[in-house]
Amino acid sequence: MALPPGPAALRHTLLLLPALLSSGWGELEPQIDGQTWAERALRENERHAFTCRVAGGPGTPRLAWYLDGQLQEASTSRLLSVGGEAFSGGTSTFTVTAHRAQHELNCSLQDPRSGRSANASVILNVQFKPEIAQVGAKYQEAQGPGLLVVLFALVRANPPANVTWIDQDGPVTVNTSDFLVLDAQNYPWLTNHTVQLQLRSLAHNLSVVATNDVGVTSASLPAPGLLATRVEVPLLGIVVAAGLALGTLVGFSTLVACLVCRKEKKTKGPSRHPSLISSDSNNLKLNNVRLPRENMSLPSNLQLNDLTPDSRAVKPADRQMAQNNSRPELLDPEPGGLLTSQGFIRLPVLGYIYRVSSVSSDEIWL
């Protein structure tokens, strides 16, 4: 016959009874803020303390915190033990500073006796105000009056932002179907907002405003900067075309002037003056040219050898003219006569060259 339990054993059983009834004796289920799985929205840089609770059971379990799979150190931890083989319950607290890169917080409980483990999880939804990563526009000619403008803005926000395009006349009404949304799995919180407009007048500036529950962000889009790609290319083409046209005109004018000069030279013909050909000794020589009368000047660098013609080539008419124009006392019909003895050299047909003394030099030729 079994004896009734003593006072000490009865007191021990009464202490374990609430834990055994709530957990089902051996079923260890941790909870974070009273829930096994939950989602919590936090603002960026917000601090929040999470508490993990576990009911009593046999043995003494171990509690640990994991943030995105990384083991964390608990802020406070307390387990209530009842005897050596059971505990009545425990709590553990962990404080999180929210960042947008954080996603999940886990409280893990492990039973050392059975090796079983249980987890409680909280999904972190970190919210932040919109960030405009990039904004731009592309212009093209429209079929009607004005310009066809494609505006785009890359906005990063959580929760997703409402984007409004504003010009100098106020907000631009845009159909949401014109928005192109990128794949959120590959680009978290990044949305491409694109809208196509037709401007009938050039706005001073364009701006985009992104708003959500956390905050508001705006960015301006100056019109002169946007129209640079549309204006610079035609202007450059005009400058290049003007330069080419000017160069062509100058070249054509030069060619016409050269042709006119050549035509005039051919029309006038050769010069009436005798041509002088320069010799190797830099002296001018007469080439088959009849010398002028004796009272005309000769070139200063002319030598006597250049003016001595062949006596056989002298015509009788020229000889008679020279005798009529010469003084009788200076005639020298025979070589080596009076003129030769007086220092004169007779040049038949062509006249005489006189050599006299000079004050500035030894002699001068006339």
Swiss-Prot record:
Q: Which intervals carry biased composition (Polar residues)?
A: 299-308
Q: What is this protein called?
A: Transmembrane protein 25
Q: Which Pfam families match?
A: C2-set_2 (PF08205)
Q: Where in the cell is it found?
A: Late endosome; Lysosome
Name the organs or tissues of expression. Expressed throughout the brain with higher levels in the pyramidal cell layer of the hippocampal CA1 and CA3 regions. Also highly expressed within the hippocampal dentate gyrus region and cerebellum and in scattered neurons in the cerebral cortex.
Organism annotation: Homo sapiens
Instruction: Please indicate the ranges of residues that lie on the Cytoplasmic side.
Output: 254-366
* Encoding gene per record: TMEM25
Where does the UniProt annotation place the signal sequence?
1-26
Q: What domain of life does the UniProt record list for this protein's source?
A: Eukaryota
Function in brief: In neurons, modulates the degradation of NMDA receptor GRIN2B subunit. Plays a role in the regulation of neuronal excitability.
Extracellular compartment residues: 27-232
PROSITE patterns of this UniProt entry?
Answer: IG_LIKE
Q: Which parts of the sequence are annotated with region: Disordered?
A: 299-335
Q: Name one GO biological process term.
A: regulation of protein stability
Ig-like domain ranges (all copies): 30-123
Q: Where does it mainly reside?
A: other
* Residues with attached carbohydrate: N106, N162, N175, N192, N205
Q: Does the keyword Thylakoid apply?
A: no
A Gene Ontology cellular-component term: plasma membrane
> Which parts pass through the membrane?
233-253
SS bonds (residue pairs): C52-C107
- Listed SUPFAM superfamilies: Immunoglobulin
